[in-house]
Curated annotation (Swiss-Prot):
The gene is erpA. This is Iron-sulfur cluster insertion protein ErpA. The lineage of its organism: Bacteria, Pseudomonadati, Pseudomonadota, Gammaproteobacteria, Pseudomonadales. It comes from Pseudomonas fluorescens (strain ATCC BAA-477 / NRRL B-23932 / Pf-5). HAMAP family: Fe_S_insert_ErpA. SUPFAM superfamilies: HesB-like domain. Binds 1 iron-sulfur cluster per subunit. Belongs to the HesB/IscA family. Required for insertion of 4Fe-4S clusters for at least IspG.
Length: 116
């Protein structure tokens, strides 16, 4: 009998996303704020992404740090986000945080919901 260890695939936090988080945190004047990314049921494809700023970090949260700011994900959401990339984009549709998720089999046109 063999035992295999499992290391979860990291969640990528791009420089562009980290820079935007830093800008927003600096504007608020609260360096305890972290960007929390989560997955909930809903949207046109079954699951949807959410973003919020949070001062609290739970013991079992995954934390990704870059440029002095933190991205936080709860364990339930992380199972859907392992290997994904959190980025920030500016375009004709406006500015927003986006997730490029290799686990998603389909995504909606706006990119905020997905299915696995």
């Amino acid at each position: 009998m063999s035992v295999e260890s499992f290391t979860p695939t990291a969640l990528q936090f791009t420089q562009g996303a980290a820079h935007k988080v830093k800008t927003l945190v600096d504007e608020e004047g609260n360096d305890r704020l972290k960007l929390r990314v989560f997955v909930t049921g809903g949207g046109c494809s079954g699951f949807q992404y959410g973003f919020t700023f949070d001062e609290e970090v739970a013991e079992d949260d995954t934390i990704v740090e870059r440029e002095g700011v933190s991205l936080v994900v709860d364990p339930m959401s992380f199972q859907y986000l392992a290997g994904a990339e959190v980025d920030y984009q500016e375009g004709l549709e406006g500015s927003r945080f986006v997730i490029k998720n290799p686990n998603a089999t389909t995504t909606c046109g706006c990119g905020s919901s997905f299915s696995i």
